[in-house]
Amino acid sequence: MRLRLRLTAPLLAGLRLARLSVHLLHGMAVMALRFPSLNEAGRQARIGWWSAGVLRAMGVGLHITGTARPGATLLLVNHVSWLDIAALHAAVPHARFVSKADVLRWPLLGWLIRGAGTLFIERERKRDALRVVHAMADALRAGQTVAVFPEGTTGEGPELLPFHANLLQAAIATATPIQPVVLRFADPTHRFSPAVAYVGDTTLLQSLWRVATARGLEVHVTLLMSRGSAHADRRLLAESLRSLMAEHL
């Protein structure tokens, strides 16, 4: 007769957080020692492996539907948690994120996110958004894939916040296709899991603990069909894409 031991929530969380810490430290060593000698394909492979490892360390299952469009693409991604970057990079390791500069202060994670080629925006500086849009356009012209959170901040999860249409301008200016990506974190009953919500006054440590104690957590990454952006009205396009993404949450 085979016995199954069910760990208490604090013990489960402790084991997961210990695994995450080891994984992050290993990632830092790889980035410092191996990244300089790797070509672009090698770096992308490492980013994908590391991102999937973050999810595994925290006990989060990964399910990917659809494929990323090849070539220059702007990815629109709904924003729920600090886990979003790991989830998308596990599915699309070559994507360059646009993220708030606050993440640079996250222990270990911030340094690794910077090393993955992330573009940072300082939201307190009104003109910084224009600088980032120009940087996004340069990356798209170079044939890269850029990922943005059009909501601008994390939401509760089941419903989308209004989209900031100005983030689409880089794609419109360069006639780059836009591909919506929907992240859905679910519990064992397939309902949205509130454990991942990183909103309000929740601290990073509190969010880490909630995720670490959650059982049967899964993230579903759905890559929808891309859409052309040339000569589009950015506000109308943003609202249309928001409606499309809402249908898949």
Show which residues each predicted segment covers:
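A cross-family acyltransferase "interaction/gating" segment
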Residues: 108-111, 158-232, 240
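C-terminal alpha-helix
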Residues: 243-248
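A membrane-cytosol interface segment of integral membrane proteins
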Residues: 119-140, 145
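Catalytic core of membrane glycerolipid acyltransferases/transacylases, capturing the structured
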Residues: 26-38, 42, 56-57, 70-126
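Residue-level preference for the first positions of well-ordered beta-strands
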Residues: 72-74, 145-149, 177
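A transmembrane-helix-recognition feature enriched in membrane-embedded lipid enzymes
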Residues: 2-63, 111-116, 214
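Catalytic-site beta-strand/loop segments enriched in glycine and acidic/polar residues
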Residues: 139-168
